[in-house]
């Protein structure tokens, strides 16, 4: 493993606009893209609607499918029946179901990726700002290729957990493989 790469986040995004703003700042690097997925998981643990919107923005386009308008659009007056122009990309249902299942079983799981959090304290958050520690290794790949595997430090786990990010069409880095991030941690 390489020297740690530390990404600092002043606070958790409170809404989709704050998430997108932070993403435009952080996801210009592979580690920033990985942290955006961790923040989306944290948002999901707090608020399912916000979390789903953030997850859809944090994952690579190849991991999305066209779906009906999201629930928030419906609440804001969108037509109940989708039209071609209202069909929005959404996460693949199987991916979303697995994430929901894991997070609902351990809502503190996203906190395990924040420096200073420990199982002994019930994964209680430290004071903001929040710091995420990531590493690369000789198998991480070259970011110039548009694909990079990073390893996120995780309290309550045997070691860092891998996440693969890819540069998307808009040049931002987004997660394309994250299953190890949602595996249970020590209670």
Regions found by a protein language model. Name each.
Residues 2-113:
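Core segments of small alpha/beta cavity-forming domains
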Residues 5, 27-30, 154-160, 167:
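Ser/Thr/Pro-rich, low-complexity mucin-like regions
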